[in-house]
Amino acid sequence: GSTGTPKAVVVSHRCVIDFISCFVETFNITSEENIANQAPFDFDVSIKDIFSGVFTGATVHLVPKMFFSFPTKLLDFLEERNITTLIWAVSALCIISSLDGFSYKVPSSLKKIMFSGEVMPVKHIHNWQKFITNAKYVTHYGPTEITCNCTYHIINEVIPEDGIIPMGIPFKNERVFLLDENNKLITEPGINGEVCVSGTCVAPGYYNNWDKTNSVFTQNPLEIRRFERIYRTGDLAKYG
């Protein structure tokens, strides 16, 4: 996990392979792309950088950590390396917009800007869209326990200043659904429920912690005729 005490999530090779194969297909990542790696290698977001390159032949550029304290150096790096693709934490994108980085330089080669890890403030996505108009903007949602992400939303609409960016739709190798406090499926809009995930993305569990594993990696209560393992995220969501 990214905050607090490390959760020590065990993620299998199969989970990574299945997720990345869907990821590169969904976003049409090719060998022509230059990806700027922002996430440390002990953070799950880095899986998308590393293995997108391995799967497709795209070039992965390692951004020096210190550059994220100096937006001018960071923007120079993106321009000099002809970076086409960012798969960054929200906070990294906000550094540039909050410090008015685009008044110094607007990278000309960016085509795909993807982000995850926390809610993107609308004012920051508006700032990026104002200066980089031809890029595809995509938000990702999902915890480490389901191998990085389980949903995505391509931002084609104008998000109101007081609005929020939707979680989006599931990747094709995953099923995402909402359960109420009685483990009943929620299908109506506007009703809060716990986000639950099934599919080949679900991790085996937590290293050497069976009690915690068994509390959130459970049998799907909607399936009574066959075994289906799900991850209960603890996050609440509702259909719009």
Model-assigned labels for residue ranges:
Residues 1-12, 16-19, 29, 35, ...:
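A generic "structured core" feature
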Residues 5, 43, 67, 121, ...:
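Nucleotide-sugar-dependent glycosyltransferase donor-binding/catalytic pocket residues
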Residues 7-36, 40, 44-84, 157:
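Conserved AMP-binding/adenylation subdomain of ANL enzymes
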Residues 10-12, 44, 89, 121, ...:
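GHKL-family ATP-binding catalytic core of two-component histidine kinases
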Residues 14, 91, 118, 200-201:
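Alpha-helix/helix-capping structural signal
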Residues 16, 130-139, 154-240:
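AMP-dependent adenylate-forming
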Residues 55-58, 83-87, 93, 97-166, ...:
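Gly/Ser/Thr-rich phosphate-binding loop
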